[in-house]
Amino acid sequence: MAAALTFRRLLALPRAARGFGVRVSLSGEKITHTGQVSDGKDYRGIRFVDRQKEVNENFAIDLIAQQPVNEVDRRIIACDGGGGALGHPKVYINLDKETKTGTCAYCGLQFKQQHH
């Protein structure tokens, strides 16, 4: 529950203040979504001589934050990540409380029960 509240507070901040997106290290190299930045003396950096390292700037946390909360009319919802081979194992999310927003542990989609 604390993680959901923290995530909700984070979404309330302006996009520039969230701290998501591509960051740059002190050497000017782009930092990946996992926070990896290579040392200047690392031998694996030879792959990037005369060209820049390509980092996907569409971090998953940014894309999930743009998704609206799905309002459902049931008390228990099943999330399978879209189904098929591209989804994830089916999980059931309990939406009993009136103020509760359920978040899928696999894909991060949020659900809220629409009370009549």
Curated annotation (Swiss-Prot):
Gene3D superfamilies according to UniProt: q5lls5 like domains
Subunit structure: Mammalian complex I is composed of 45 different subunits. This is a component of the iron-sulfur (IP) fragment of the enzyme.
Membrane topology: Peripheral membrane protein
Annotated Pfam families: zf-CHCC (PF10276)
Gene Ontology biological-process entries: mitochondrial electron transport, NADH to ubiquinone
Gene, per the UniProt record: Ndufs6
Keywords: Acetylation, Electron transport, Membrane, Mitochondrion, Mitochondrion inner membrane, Respiratory chain, Transit peptide, Transport
Protein name: NADH dehydrogenase [ubiquinone] iron-sulfur protein 6, mitochondrial
Transmembrane residue ranges: none
